[in-house]
């Protein structure tokens, strides 16, 4: 479902976004760990060098970023999403955040990258 219906591709930015609301997680009875590794899937698409998985629970919006090459996702996570990590594998979270607002913010960041 998430790869089929929720995958957004941004070819000019060499990026992809997958998002999952808390309602979708409940609808499919997803448990912690069920989406592990999902953020890596778009990197197998030709021309995609950055992938973001955005998920929501009752308390926060969580972002997982993966990239290849010189696309430094740790800088984005530390600057915008209270996170950090490695150059090609980073994450962040926004407590009390709205997933739609965060999704729009990620789109804007990627379009300006």
Q: Where do the PLM segments sit?
A:
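Hydrophobic helix-and-loop "lid/oligomerization" segment in the mid-to-C-terminal part
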Residues: 1-80, 85-113
């Amino acid at each position: 479902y998430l790869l089929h219906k929720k995958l957004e591709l941004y070819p000019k930015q060499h990026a992809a976004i997958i998002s999952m609301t808390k309602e979708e997680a409940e609808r499919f009875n997803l448990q912690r760990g069920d989406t592990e590794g999902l953020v890596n899937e778009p990197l197998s698409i030709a021309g995609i060098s950055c992938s973001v998985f955005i998920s929501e629970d009752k308390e926060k919006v969580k972002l997982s970023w993966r990239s290849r090459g010189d696309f430094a996702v740790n800088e984005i996570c530390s600057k915008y999403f209270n996170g950090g990590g490695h150059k090609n594998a980073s994450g962040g979270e926004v407590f009390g955040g709205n997933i739609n607002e965060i999704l729009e913010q990620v789109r804007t960041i990627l379009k300006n990258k």
